[in-house]
Amino acid sequence: MNNIIFKHQEGLQFLEDLPSNSVDLILTDPPYITSRDSGMDKWVGHVEKQDQEGARNLKTEEEFKSHKELGDWHKFFVKGDVPVPLKQWHKDYAKYKKNYLKYGSIYGKRYAVKTNYGDWDSDFTMETLDQFTKQFYRVLRDGGTAIIFFDLWKITALKEMLETCGPSYRRKQGDEMVEKTRGFKQIRFIEWIKTNPQPINSHRNYLTNCREIALTAVKKGKGTFKSHYDNGIYRYPLQGGKERFHPTQKSLPLFEALVAKHSEPGDIIVDPFAGSATTAIACMNTGRRFMGCEMSEEYFTKAEGRIQRNQERLNKEQSSSV
């Protein structure tokens, strides 16, 4: 744990305490400023109510048999565009029936995910993000890289911030002295394609929430990049199971790949929006040093537990290999 520094702190305050030119890589996932009230939030409340002790089933056996969503599923079960044979339908029949009786939907609570994430997203602004990019530029060493995941529809604004987030300077242009601003160079897009995307209102929106975008940017000089003919497209699943507890949690294998390609063992990696501590875990698993923070007390506590469990796993693997 000596290579992990994780604080319960606001991100800008955390960065302001770091020395200039001291960080090798920033890998982070700031709020996308996309919170909204929607039917998905109502469904989360509905599921929570049905999960309470003593809650009655919403539907009857007869309603399940005649449920319109089943259609011809007694013959085949359509998964995406692919008909699954009757045998597969029977395999899942008990699960779908249980879900429908309890929640009123064969999918149960599978897609009960909030779209209003809370104050940490709705109170974040583009002006605040601009302040973060300036700190990113200051704390990174020359040749250091920033990788920032952000909302697809605001990514151009982020690119413009990165291009002008450095210090100002004056230079002669013709007969006049003009003021210029330094910024990140070699700004590129990378794309994460989720191999198990979560449908967003799948009855109305046939396009699932299947991809996210990040920008990579280098501060001066030549950045660390240990790959050849890389197309910048990464196909990894969403985090699942007990270690998923943050609504915008990123894929651990994805972050491990990004850390391995854009840094060296022993390098210092920073994430001021640590969330579920995915960046920290990726650093632990690849031999890097991590420094980061999370301002939400709830997620900080859960992330601390995740870091501790991962350290215990690593210790166990190390002792068993001796």
Question: At which residue positions do the language-model features occur?
Answer:
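Short hydrophobic/aromatic beta-strand or adjacent loop that forms the aromatic wall/cage
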Residues: C210-A214
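S-adenosyl-L-methionine-dependent nucleic acid methyltransferase catalytic domains
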Residues: M1-Q198, N205, N209, K220-V322
